[in-house]
């Protein structure tokens, strides 16, 4: 709805408020994570970077569900699944243009997390992808970058699924499986920190 950096700033201010009010809210500071799907996955990735850079209380995890972190879209899934699978590559390019109307935004790692020099020091990551999604390789490549930068990260790709299946809990059993898998992974991460 609003171009960069409005959504990023809103998310960061919200996270900062939660951290500052954790005692009043009876929240365990060691269990705060960030997550989102699609554009929300981009924001979650960017918030993880910004929280690290601004030395906010360390986040416990980042949940990235088919994130859009690479504006170039120069990868195989963007051409293989460009049309006919829900989200199209053409639509994705249009969304990027709306979010980043100024050229200087396109080189900012808080807008395009794949451009971050390194991801070291960001929280453990759970990266989710759908098989038939223009963004499958985006998620896969970001996971590889996390691992290369020594960030604990798991990658799960759901065969036969399309972008947006996270929101199909009453429609497909794979969405229910995804919810269970996410809970299992978050519990494993939080269990390691106790």
Identify the residue ranges that each predicted region occupies.
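Alpha/beta-hydrolase superfamily serine-hydrolase fold, recognizing
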Residues: 1-194
């Amino acid at each position: 709805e609003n171009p960069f950096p409005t959504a990023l700033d809103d998310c960061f201010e919200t996270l900062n408020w939660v951290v500052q009010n954790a005692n009043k809210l009876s929240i365990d500071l060691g269990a705060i994570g960030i997550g989102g799907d699609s554009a929300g996955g981009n924001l979650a990735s960017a918030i993880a970077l910004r929280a690290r850079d601004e030395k906010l209380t360390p986040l416990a995890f980042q949940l990235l569900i088919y994130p859009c972190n690479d504006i170039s879209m120069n990868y195989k899934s963007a051409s293989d699944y460009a049309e006919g699978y829900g989200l199209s590559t053409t639509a994705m390019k249009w969304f990027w243009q709306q979010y980043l109307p100024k050229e200087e935004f396109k080189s900012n790692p808080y807008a395009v997390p794949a451009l971050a020099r390194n991801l070291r020091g960001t929280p453990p990551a759970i990266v989710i992808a759908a098989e038939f999604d223009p963004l499958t390789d985006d998620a896969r490549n970001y996971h590889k970058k996390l691992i290369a930068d020594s960030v604990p990260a798991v990658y799960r790709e759901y065969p036969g699924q399309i972008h947006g299946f996270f929101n199909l809990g009453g429609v497909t059993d794979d969405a229910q499986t995804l919810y269970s898998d996410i809970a299992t992974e978050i519990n494993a991460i939080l269990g390691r920190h106790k």
